[in-house]
């Protein structure tokens, strides 16, 4: 990993995650600090392990981007898979929530129809 390329690498990952967090959770992440994002994200239902993994990723990115630090090879190798895991798991939970809401609405609708015909 070339240290000069780490800033662009982490900026790309965190910018994409900020956009996703905004779209998924309605948190204006593009205009917030890492601390502000994770303060708001804490109450959003993100599983604790994913929350901590993303918080670590964002904090590492902040050090690389703003403190001119270099991340370890292990941190670099783990960054993209962690971001993909976060999006995959939280998106799947969103789909499950939407499916449950759809089924509940269908059940309520069919119960009204059955009750109305009796």
Functional labels for PLM-detected ranges:
Residues 1-118:
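Membrane-proximal, non-transmembrane interaction modules
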């Amino acid at each position: 990993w070339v240290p000069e390329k780490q800033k662009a690498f982490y900026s790309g990952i965190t910018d994409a995650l900020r956009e996703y967090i905004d779209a998924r959770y309605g948190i204006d992440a593009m205009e917030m600090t890492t601390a502000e994002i994770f303060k708001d994200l804490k109450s959003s239902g993100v599983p604790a392990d994913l929350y901590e993994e993303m918080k670590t990723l964002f904090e590492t990115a902040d050090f690389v981007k703003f403190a001119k630090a270099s991340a370890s090879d292990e941190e670099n190798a783990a960054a993209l898979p962690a971001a993909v895991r976060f999006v995959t798991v939280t998106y799947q939970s969103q789909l499950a929530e939407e499916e449950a809401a759809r089924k509940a609405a269908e059940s309520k609708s069919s119960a009204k129809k059955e009750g109305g015909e009796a």
